[in-house]
Structures are given as C-alpha cells and as structure tokens.
C-alpha cells in the first residue's frame, strides 16, 4: 500500500477534517460508559440519537440535528428499556422511526414526533422478542422497507418485519451462528450478510436461509469488525503480534485476504466507515483522537492512504450523517459525530474537499447516491427478490428516481392512522405477549424485567397523538383513555407512598428491637 499521497493522483488527496466549535456542538450530553464496542450514536437529516448513561434502565437522547450549545440536564429521553441500551439505528426510509437494542433481550421500534421529543417516551410502537440473551447489534436492511436484522449473545441472528400488525412481533427468519457475533454488515442490495465472530473468522451468509457461503481460514489477521465496501469486504482487527490491522477481502473467496496492513499498536477497536460514492474508507479507533482515510480500489494495491485527522480528544463512539444530509454547497463529502465522553460533548466533524468555487454544486463530488425511498417491501425481499437502492441526486431540487415498476401500497403499510393509533392505545392495558412462540422456549427474563412484561411506568404523554384531530367519537374515547391513565398514575403514586411507609415502619421496628436487646 502506498503511504505517500503524492503517489496516487486522487481528487480527494487534500480532504481535511473541520471540527465544529463548542458553540455548534452538543454540550452536556451524559454519554454512556458501556464497554460494548458499538457506535452509540445514529444520525439522520432531522435528529441525532445518543445512548446516555442512566440508572434504573436504559435510555437515549433524541435531539434536533440543528441543536446548538448545551443540552439541558432534564432533557426528555426515550427510556422504555429496563436495562442498558447497547445500540440505536435510524430507519433509512423513515426519519421519524428509530430502533434500539438492549441488555433486556429486546429490540424496540420507536416513533419520534416530528417536532422532537417534548415528553419522556416510555412506550415503544413495537417490541421485538425472540432473543434469550442481550442484543448487541442491529442493522436496517439497505433496500427493503421495515426490515431489521438483530444479533445477540445467544448465537442467533434474527430478521424482523416491523410492518406486521401487533405491538409484539416474532422474527420472520432465525439464523444460528457457530460463534458469538462481533460485527455484521449487509451488502449494498441486502443479498448477503457478512459477519465477524468471536473466533476471529469472517463468514458470508445468505440471510434468508442462514447458509454459510464463505468462511475465512486461520490467518494472522484476527478480525473484530467487518464492513461491505462495494464488491469487497473490509475488516479491522489485530495481528498475531497485537498490532492493529486493516484487511481487504474478496467476498467470494475468503481463503486469503487481498491485502493486510498493520497500522499501530493501540488497543482500541477500529471502526470502518465506507462511502460508496467517493470510494473513501475511514478508520476511526475507539479511544483514539485520530481518523485515517483512504481511497479503496478494486485493483492492487487496493488501498491508497490519503491523510489523517488528528485531535487531542479521544472518541468513544461515532455517528455518521447520511449523504442526503450533507452540506453540498460547502463541498462536504462526509460528516462524523464524535462522542467525547471526557467533555460530555458530541462534536460534528466535517470532511471537506477544498475547491476554489464555494457555494456551487460540484457534480464530480456528488454522483447519484442512495435515497430515502425503499426499493421493495419486506415481503418482496422475503420471497427472494433482490434490488439495489433507489438513487437520488444531491443537487438541490432533484428527486429520487425509481427504475422499478410502481406497486400499490399494501394495507397496513406506512405509518399508523388515527384509528390504528386509538385501537393500540385502548388495547394497551390488556396487551399480553403471545404464548405460542415456539422459538422462544429458551428465553428467560432477567432480574431487571417487570413481571409479566407489563409496563407500570406508562404515562398519558408517552406517545404523541397524531396532528390531525380524530372524529368526535374517537376524541371522546381518547379523552376517556387519558383520564383512566391519570387515575392509574395517581393510584400508582399512592401505592409507592404506601410501600415507602411500610419500609420505614419495618426499619423503625427493627431499630426498636435492637435497642431492647441492647438494654437487656
């Protein structure tokens, strides 16, 4: 690999990183201290979600992406998990929908109000139950609508269709893996699933059947993260001498890597990020303050080192803005959101290509890119179809082009209407999880779970109602529902006070008995 940028004439060889000032960053964010090797941050053009540290459960913040300055300490959060949140991911085709996974063995799907989180959200739209141990990884399908992939410490990969009816869903596909998964990545069209396991081997699977297509042998490269980069695979890990490495693979032949390159002797995990439009690969280390970037090609030497962004503040995790949210007039080609735990800071970092004409759309920097519309439904993918992403131009005013025939929307797809919302809210009190899930026999709730999987912390403002006013009859039912929720909350508060009083009396009785024993 060439380490001299002058040896490779690339229009990206002068890319530089521009960090936002503290006034334009997110200050005062209580970033999670979890040791799990995840990004802990997800971004779309509307919101940024950051996993936070909290007691008594798991939560994450959802802030407007244009928020500036300090975040209030009592900022409302999304806090429906009963254990620590391990990862969050925005739906690529719905900027108001986000998925989260947790140590409580569940995956939850949340609806975020268009005006932002004004009240604490404690009830999810969907709860996905199927894993018997903590869920560490989630990924949305890149081209199919409402299709989610999750991986847990039970050696299982599950595929979910979140467009199905019901508050609690079962997986539509369940794959068994030979080892614990450390990283998963779907190909650009979602046809293949690459994974990195605890035995440090790479595997390529067919996600519908779970059949292993390729498996790497015992090489000197011990992979910890894997990423699909066009028609190639990129993995990061360590060598047998504990030197951090990056490797490039042919997904159709994992017997030997195409390229192995040692980087340094640091111990932090390297997160790979790939931009398919510019063919640039970014390597950011957990606990590092630097980000290396390269240009990836399909011919030798495969990787061309460009340059490096350096900072004195180490990052714990990173989020990435989709291409449709970049500042194209400022020649911004990539944007990170660095989680700096020492400063309780989320710092935007823009990768910029210097150009003489600023404020003009540069067509050579922004080819057609993946848009915000799905190429097919979840059922179409499950039936065996494969489609690439629908492309859009980043030029202001351009629209997404659809080369596939239009289909009439199926019933039940899209966001729930007012009637569905009302029925879901009225049925919430008596909602129970199905008892006929044959594939959940190994699932056991931990000590942090509430008995019966009930939701005692429900509040009348846990979900935002639709902006369109419902008909009068539905409005009356909704008012009755909220009134009942108020009564339930008051009774719950009274019960909590009684329990506190009982505990106090028990302690007083115990102290009196101890005094009497000491006296006699």
Language-model features: where?
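Classical protein tyrosine phosphatase
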Residues: 97-110
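A short alpha->loop->secondary-structure connector
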Residues: 116-121, 166-169
């Amino acid at each position: 690999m060439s380490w001299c940028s002058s040896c490779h004439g690339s229009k990206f060889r002068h890319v530089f990183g521009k960090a936002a000032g503290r006034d334009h960053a997110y200050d005062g964010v209580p970033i999670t201290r979890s040791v799990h090797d995840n990004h802990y941050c997800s971004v779309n053009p509307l919101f940024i979600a950051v996993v936070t540290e909290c007691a008594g459960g798991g939560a994450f913040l959802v802030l407007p992406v244009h928020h500036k300055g300090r975040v209030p300490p009592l900022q409302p959060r999304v806090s429906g998990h009963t254990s620590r949140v391990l990862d969050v991911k925005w739906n690529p085709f719905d900027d108001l929908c986000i998925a989260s996974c947790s140590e409580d063995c569940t995956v939850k799907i949340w609806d975020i109000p268009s005006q932002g989180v004004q009240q604490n959200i404690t009830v999810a739209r969907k709860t996905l139950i199927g894993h018997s141990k903590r869920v560490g990884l989630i990924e949305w399908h890149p081209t199919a609508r409402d299709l989610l992939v999750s991986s847990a410490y039970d050696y299982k990969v599950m595929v979910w269709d979140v467009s199905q009816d019901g508050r609690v869903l079962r997986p539509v596909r369940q794959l068994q893996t030979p080892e614990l998964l450390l990283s998963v990545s779907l190909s650009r069209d979602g046809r293949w699933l690459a994974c990195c396991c605890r035995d440090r081997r790479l595997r390529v699977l067919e996600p519908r059947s779970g059949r292993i297509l390729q498996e790497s042998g015992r090489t000197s490269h011990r992979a910890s993260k894997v990423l699909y980069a066009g028609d190639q695979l990129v993995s990061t890990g360590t060598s047998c001498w504990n030197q951090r490495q990056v490797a490039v693979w042919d997904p159709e032949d994992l017997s030997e890597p195409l390229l192995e390159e040692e980087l340094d002797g640091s111990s932090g995990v390297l997160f790979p990020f790939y931009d398919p439009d510019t063919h640039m690969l970014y390597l950011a280390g957990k606990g590092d303050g630097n980000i290396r970037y390269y240009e990836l090609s399909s011919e030798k030497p495969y990787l061309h080192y460009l340059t490096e962004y350096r900072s004195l503040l180490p990052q714990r995790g990173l989020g990435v803005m989709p291409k449709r949210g970049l500042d194209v007039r400022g020649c911004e080609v990539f944007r990170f959101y660095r989680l700096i735990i020492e400063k309780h800071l989320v710092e935007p970092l823009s990768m910029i290509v210097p150009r003489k004409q600023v404020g003009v759309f540069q067509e050579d920097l922004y080819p057609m890119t993946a848009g915000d519309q799905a190429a097919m439904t979840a059922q179409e993918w499950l039936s065996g179809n494969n489609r690439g992403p629908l492309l859009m131009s980043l030029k202001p005013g351009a629209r997404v082009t659809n080369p596939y025939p239009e289909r009439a929307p199926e019933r039940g797809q899209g966001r729930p209407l007012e009637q569905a919302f009302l029925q879901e809210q009225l049925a919430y009190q008596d909602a129970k999880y199905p008892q006929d899930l044959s594939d959940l026999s190994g699932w056991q709730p931990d000590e942090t779970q509430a008995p019966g999987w009930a939701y005692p912390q429900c509040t009348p403002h846990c979900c935002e109602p639709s902006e369109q006013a419902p008909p009068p009859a539905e409005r009356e039912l909704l008012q009755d529902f909220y009134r009942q929720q108020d009564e339930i909350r008051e009774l719950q508060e009274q019960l909590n006070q009684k329990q506190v009083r009982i505990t106090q009396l028990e302690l007083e009785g115990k102290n009196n008995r101890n005094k009497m024993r000491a006296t006699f």
